[in-house]
Amino acid sequence: MLPKNCTHLGECNSDCLTRSEIQALFREVINTLKHTMNTENVCAHMLDIVSFERIKEYIRANLGHYTVITDKCSKRKVCLHHKRIARLLGIKKIYHQEYKRVVSKVYKKQTW
């Protein structure tokens, strides 16, 4: 079943969560680990594959516990976005390179 566009009136879906909100979620997860004194590799960069793997596993294991609350939507369950989050966690390039790749892919064939 294809997801419907979010109307912000009730159930919010995968089209509703922005990349910046996902990045903020990653920062909050790392802050939670620091707060609980679980500090192993919390300073690891996302591209440091070996060191950041424990953080990735923690995020994956706890997706069902996270909810994003903003002024446009009161509750957005993060677990509904698991594929998108997995893709972001799997990026092996800096974001500038990833942005250039996506933009060139999207706008390679101009239709307007």
From Swiss-Prot:
**Signal sequence interval, chain numbering:** none
Q: Which InterPro entries match?
A: Baculo_LEF-11
Q: Which UniProt keywords apply?
A: Transcription, Transcription regulation
Any one Pfam family match given in the protein's UniProt record, by short name: Baculo_LEF-11
Please, one GO biological process term? regulation of DNA-templated transcription
Q: Which organism is it from?
A: Rachiplusia ou multiple nucleopolyhedrovirus (strain R1)
The text of the family note is: Belongs to the baculoviridae LEF-11 family.
Q: What does this protein do?
A: Involved in late/very late gene activation.
Q: What is this protein called?
A: Late expression factor 11
